[in-house]
């Protein structure tokens, strides 16, 4: 497996993606999962990334502890509020800027995070959104008829969803 250099933002987006889909119980396990994705990382850098992302270890039902981003409280909120609250947090964490044109809202993310966020926006099924197209760091979100790109961008970035 060859590794490729990545930016800090792209690496952290990949860490968020892995922690979202896998119960990671150690930094060694996370490092191996990142290596499988082509990202070679030192323990010091991984530890710093986890700290910057606010990752915490939690233990559920007497089992092994595992990493989550945002802690047990956010997981509890996810169970109560469902995917929209998770989307709000993801938008807060991943959108670095936004713009609009016509009925399209454009969201800019760190490198490597756009497809992950666009996929989640599509899965949530927001009534104002027809669908998303994503590149590496840019998402075009198509608004339904009657809603402009400006209004959609404001809804997505101001927790109005």
From Swiss-Prot:
Which terms does the record give in the GO molecular function aspect? arginine binding; DNA binding; DNA-binding transcription factor activity
The question of whether Iron-sulfur is a record keyword is answered with no
Q: Where in the cell is it found?
A: Cytoplasm
- A matching Pfam family: Arg_repressor_C
One GO term of the biological process aspect: L-arginine biosynthetic process
The UniProt entry, under Gene3D superfamilies, shows:
3.30.1360.40, Winged helix-like DNA-binding domain superfamily/Winged helix DNA-binding domain
Q: Where does the source fall among the domains of life?
A: Bacteria
- List cystine links: none
Pathway where this protein functions: Amino-acid biosynthesis; L-arginine biosynthesis [regulation]
Keywords (alphabetical) are:
Amino-acid biosynthesis, Arginine biosynthesis, Cytoplasm, DNA-binding, Repressor, Transcription, Transcription regulation
> One GO term of the cellular component aspect?
cytoplasm
Family (UniProt): Belongs to the ArgR family.
Described by its record, this protein's role is as follows: Regulates arginine biosynthesis genes.
Entry protein name: Arginine repressor
Organism source for this protein? Corynebacterium aurimucosum (strain ATCC 700975 / DSM 44827 / CIP 107346 / CN-1) (Corynebacterium nigricans)
Q: What broad taxonomic lineage does this protein's source fall under?
A: Bacteria, Bacillati, Actinomycetota, Actinomycetes, Mycobacteriales
Q: Source gene? A: argR
């Amino acid at each position: 497996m060859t590794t490729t250099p990545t930016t800090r933002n792209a690496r952290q987006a990949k860490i968020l993606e892995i922690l979202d889909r896998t119960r990671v119980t150690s930094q060694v396990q996370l490092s191996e999962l990142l290596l499988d994705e082509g990202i070679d990382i030192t323990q010091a850098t991984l530890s710093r990334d986890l700290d910057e992302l606010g990752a915490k270890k939690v233990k559920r039902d007497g089992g092994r502890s595992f990493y989550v981003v945002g802690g047990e409280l956010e997981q509890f909120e996810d169970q109560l509020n469902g995917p929209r609250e998770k989307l709000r947090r993801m938008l807060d964490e991943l959108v670095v800027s936004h713009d609009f044109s016509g009925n399209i809202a454009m969201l800019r993310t760190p490198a490597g995070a756009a497809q992950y966020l666009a996929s989640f926006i599509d899965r949530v099924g927001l009534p104002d959104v027809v669908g998303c197209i994503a590149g590496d760091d840019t998402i075009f979100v198509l608004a339904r008829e009657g809603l402009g790109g400006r209004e959609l961008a404001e809804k997505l970035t101001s927790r109005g969803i």
